[in-house]
């Protein structure tokens, strides 16, 4: 019963003397007036092939909406206030390792950019210039700047979000992929697949601090809370490397499996930073690293070519985007088992969770 209809019924019952029903309806009216937003959180998935965003409700663990975005949505991050989601869009055709790029269709540069998705409106409201072939990025702590990797241009671009313009581009290693800010927001770390390096950029000055070698096809970076240590995964080495971020050099490899069979992709720290979760691509698993010993501490099956991953707000559930099978695995971290697989559209890639 709608508010106005209920109010009319209350008036009629008051005049008719139906006190019991009147009391019941008043109670219902108060409940309607005091109702709040549904509890829970939402999981947002970029789908690279179908060019859209899947929105999953945590209560039902089902897709509640699918919103078109543009070509090849991959990297995804939320603004610090959680009101906006940014998505990297690319008009460049997919180019798997070993493929002669001269045989591919020409890139659609008009499709390159950063999509701006309004969480409250549940739609994309704007497109920012993102440089050539944007893939992954991070957002400044004040929410004013995006730092994005431009894979086919070997650089990281700084985007002024309010103006929607690129303010500068810093040269990095070849084919930059992962981009991550240090916890204090002062430095930007960019991994480069082509030459196996990590570039360190001063965020305020917009200058290159250092570039150093790590391993073959480094993908992503994650920092420990102290920012004195970081981890970077090397896809073609089947390993994760521990970094000394004070010296900006590699400390030790953490071997997860046979190179080629295990391809480390996404990284996510547990809420207490005691465990590092690593998706393994064609390995079909998530590996667990104990950050106190920096040794592997087990693994569990999740699905076909898991890529992006994210934790629930309470840290008890892990979500992985599984590209070839077009689904998202819901993992109970207490038992390390998949409790559900949620179908999305084409080629799920990145994951963000918002409360």
Where are the regions that the model predicts?
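Bacterial N-terminal signal peptides
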Residues: 16-32
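N-terminal secretory signal peptides that target proteins for export/translocation
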Residues: 1-15
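Predominantly soluble domains enriched in secretory-pathway, periplasmic, or organellar proteins
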Residues: 31-355
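Intrinsically disordered regions, especially transient/low-confidence alpha-helical propensity segments
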Residues: 3, 18-19, 304, 346
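Extended rod-forming repeat segments used as scaffolds/tethers
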Residues: 10-12, 19, 297, 339
